Regions:
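Bacterial N-terminal signal peptides
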Residues: 7-17
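Exposed beta-sheet edge and beta->alpha loop/turn motif
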Residues: 99-170
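Bacterial N-terminal signal peptides that target proteins for export
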Residues: 1-7
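Short, low-complexity N-terminal intrinsically disordered segments enriched in polar/charged residues
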Residues: 18-54, 58-65, 74
Length: 170
């Protein structure tokens, strides 16, 4: 009976330890994941601007590339093309699980211009589109790749009204 109790206690201790995994990345992991995120976002911008998802290879999983391809097809069906430029991003949080999975929550800042796909005419521009995004990454053969991207929120900053001072004599 005592032997079974010891085995049970050891098993429970192992389960608790596994459930309390430290998800804080090491400095090297943080740098590697941030580099992968940056490279993916630049490739994503190029994919949107050129309507070519091949630039995502090596940065994203086949499923993620297929998801981007679907979005690009939807743009073409609405006769739109997007020219996207990544202005910057800031990592809000990062967690590493079992040394091979990462979750990164970030704020992305984009300069986005929408064009007619056929006539090339500008339909609209937002030079500072903000997106709160969640990226899922996986370490594959020593390289972090994006396996999923979820846009949590979008924000279009509203320009502040400019106050015009009255001219003298008014």
């Amino acid at each position: 009976m005592a032997k079974h109790m010891i085995v049970l206690v050891l098993a429970l201790t192992m389960l608790v330890a596994a459930g309390c995994e430290n998800t804080d990345p090491t400095p090297a992991q943080r740098e590697a994941v941030e580099t992968a995120v940056r490279d993916y976002l630049f490739a994503l911008a190029e994919a949107y601007s050129t309507l070519d998802t091949s630039v995502l290879e090596g940065h994203a999983s086949p499923n993620e590339i297929a998801a981007v391809r679907k979005l690009l097809k939807q743009l073409v069906q609405t006769a739109d093309r997007i020219d996207a430029e990544l202005i910057g991003f800031e990592v809000d949080s990062m967690a590493i699980f079992r040394h091979i999975n990462a979750t990164v929550r970030l704020i992305e800042v984009w300069d986005v211009t929408r064009y007619g796909a056929f006539d090339g005419r500008e339909k609209g521009r937002n030079p500072s589109s903000l997106q709160s995004t969640l990226l899922q990454l996986r370490l594959v053969d020593g390289t972090w790749i994006v396996v999923g991207r979820s846009i949590l929120s979008r924000e279009t900053p509203v320009p502040e009204p400019q106050i015009v001072a009255p001219e003298a004599g008014d």
